[in-house]
Amino acid sequence: MTNTILRLPVVLTERGRSRSSHYQDIKEGLFTHPVQIGLRAVGWPANEVMEINSARIAGKSEAEIRVLVKKLEADRKAA
């Protein structure tokens, strides 16, 4: 597995969401928080974007996606 970090424009394209919808999803626990990659730069681990997209494609409920998001963020801290 690679540790690629995707910047916002790529994440929005991958998700098919607008910027405001993306940040609303983060606020509602439906997407992971970004990681700091510079003083004024953030990004998202590619594997997290892929896992959340796969869950949506599989028809997972919002509650199931919230559980996945919590797991992904906990895994970050454990790494």
Give residue spans per PLM region:
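Polyanion-binding surface elements
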Residues: 1-28, 51-58
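Short, solvent-exposed alpha-helical "recognition" segments
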Residues: 28-35, 61
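Short Lys/Arg-enriched helix C-cap and helix-to-coil transition segments
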Residues: 35-41
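A short, Lys/Arg-enriched interface patch at domain edges and termini
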Residues: 50-78
